[in-house]
Amino acid sequence: VRVSLFVSGCRHHCKGCFNSETWDFHYGVPFTEETQDKILELLKPGYIQGFTLLGGEPFEPENQQVLVHLLKKIRETYPQKDIWCYSGYLLDKDMQPGGAVYTEYTKEMLKQIDVLIDGEFVEAKKDLTLIFRGSSNQRIMCLKDGEFAGMWQK
């Protein structure tokens, strides 16, 4: 069992997106300290394995400053719980210095994440038999200190 946060704002606009209402950066309710406190409270029980960050697009530059603070707080409070993140951006291209979404917060955000599922959803590559991803182009990667550490194995 996991706790999940769906963020608002996404520029990918993938055809067939399961959550297209979150493309709008103003969708939903503002993220507040109370929201963070609620997430931390929900993560407390031992049966909660970890936290998943989805969207929308967590790595949109507008989202990174708030999210890095949240992820660091989760990591500090619950070091035994894992953090997964879904992003349509590519780790080895867009999230590197000079990449499309690289900001002063990107590296620190990546350092908090254990498993990153990257790549846009591609409807033509949709495969319902895949676990934890919607299309075959998406990769499930383990991260260590913000760097690629191998492909995730079930």
Report each predicted region and the residues it spans:
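Residues at the C-termini of beta-strands that transition into short coil/loop
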Residues: 87, 120, 144
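N-terminal pre-triad scaffold of radical SAM enzymes
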Residues: 1-13
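P-loop/Walker A phosphate-binding loop and immediately adjacent motor/lid segment at beta-alpha junctions
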Residues: 70-75, 126-154
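Receiver (REC) domain switch/active-site residues of two-component response regulators
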Residues: 114
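Conserved Radical SAM active-site core
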Residues: 19-99, 104, 108-109
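Flexible, gly/pro- and Lys/Arg-enriched active-site loops
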Residues: 103, 109-111, 119-138
